[in-house]
Regions:
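Charged, low-complexity intrinsically disordered terminal segments
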Residues: 15-362
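Sec-dependent N-terminal signal peptides
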Residues: 4-13
Length: 362
């Protein structure tokens, strides 16, 4: 049996969710449907038009140290291009080392493109300033800001790029919960150790992540980057160690429901257990209803959130929601070893979601 991993991004979907499938799960016992939870979710994603591939190698990177060692090594081996898309590049030791390495790759003839979110940079306590961007560009690195703030600023509040994507030569990709910052290794004084999850992917799912990057890049820069050089063929033969990966993407100003429907569908499909780790647990109405109904069916629902947070009052808001779920029958754990920023969910020990998506209205 192949492991299923569904990667969930915090942007609006380009596609419409299949609400009828979710409705059937709300009213029918799982046994009467006759499908395991992973098969139900795969069917939902396929009918929603979500890209799914089954010839992937996936390596989970369970710490900042693991992520940056692996990413830097892949960048050193790059031959054609390096694409980076992050919510922010914090101007610290890790970012400085990264841009030094990227500058060296430019000298070797490798194309380097990097993109960061304007709000993510502004809200960062060590932002990239004009002088930093000037130096980076002088080294031959193309770096652009996603959706710079213009008047009226309120129009840009929810139109943000929360992705964390790296694509190397179209053959290796990285995604997950980590931006570029040294606190993923060193922690922060007020909250302690910063724990997060990232992953390295090889296989056809790399093409899906490349397509996401190039779509946003070309829109922001008015360029037309693309072609076969950016989408090398991957080995089509699969074996039992390969992993099925589905990329659930959200694109601002399109459809606000795909991500919440994908989460809700995953929860409704559960037959035995749902395990959730999420740092900002303020679920939408649809996800909250899915959790209530799944608990009422006797499914074991376990949720872990951090007692510390980088955003004030977030733990208080989460506890209010979690108290209601505990009264319903959920098991709740508080993580006290620092800040657990991972965004993961496991269902029936059959599939998991990993990504940048928080369980809140954004």
């Amino acid at each position: 049996m192949k492991l299923r991993i569904f990667i969930l991004f915090l942007f609006l979907s380009l596609l419409h969710a299949q609400a009828d499938i979710i409705d059937s799960l709300k009213t029918q016992p799982r046994d009467s449907i006759g499908l395991a939870s992973d098969s139900l979710v795969l069917r939902f994603l396929e009918e929603s038009g979500i890209p799914i591939s089954d010839n992937n190698k996936v390596k989970l990177l369970k710490s900042g140290r693991e992520k940056f060692i692996d990413l830097f090594e892949a960048i050193r081996e790059a031959k054609h291009h390096i694409h980076l898309e992050y919510f922010n590049f914090r101007n610290d030791s890790i970012a400085n080392a990264l841009f030094d390495l990227l500058a060296q790759k430019v000298k070797e003839g490798v194309e380097v493109r990097a993109m960061f979110d304007a709000f993510g940079n502004w809200s960062n306590n060590k932002p990239l300033k004009k002088k930093h961007l000037k130096k980076i560009r002088e080294q031959g690195i193309e770096i652009v800001k996603f959706d710079p703030f213009t008047f009226p600023y309120i129009n840009h509040a929810a139109h943000r790029d929360h992705r964390k994507i790296a694509v190397i030569d179209g053959k290796i990709a990285y995604t997950g919960g980590m931006n570029i910052a040294d606190y993923y290794i060193n922690g922060l004084p007020k909250i302690g150790t910063w724990r997060d999850m990232h992953m390295r992917i090889e296989g056809d799912a790399v093409n899906d992540l490349q397509e996401i990057f190039l779509t946003i890049w070309n829109k922001e820069t008015k360029q037309n980057v693309g072609g076969a050089a950016y989408f090398p063929l991957h080995e089509s033969k699969t074996d039992s160690t390969d992993i099925i990966v589905a990329i659930v993407d959200r694109t601002p100003k399109k459809n606000s429901r795909m991500l919440s429907h994908a989460y809700a569908m995953s929860i409704y499909s559960a037959q035995k257990n749902v395990h959730i780790v999420n740092p900002y647990f303020v679920p939408t109405s649809s996800i909250k209803k899915a959790l209530y109904r799944t608990i009422d069916r006797g499914v074991d629902v376990t949720i872990m959130v951090s007692s510390a947070s980088d955003i004030p009052f977030t733990p208080d808001a989460a506890l209010y929601k979690l108290h209601k779920l505990m009264k319903r029958g959920a098991t709740v754990y508080m993580y006290n070893g620092g800040f657990h920023h991972s965004k993961i969910m496991m269902v029936d020990d059959l599939f998991c979601t990993v990504g940048t998506a928080n369980l809140n209205s954004r």
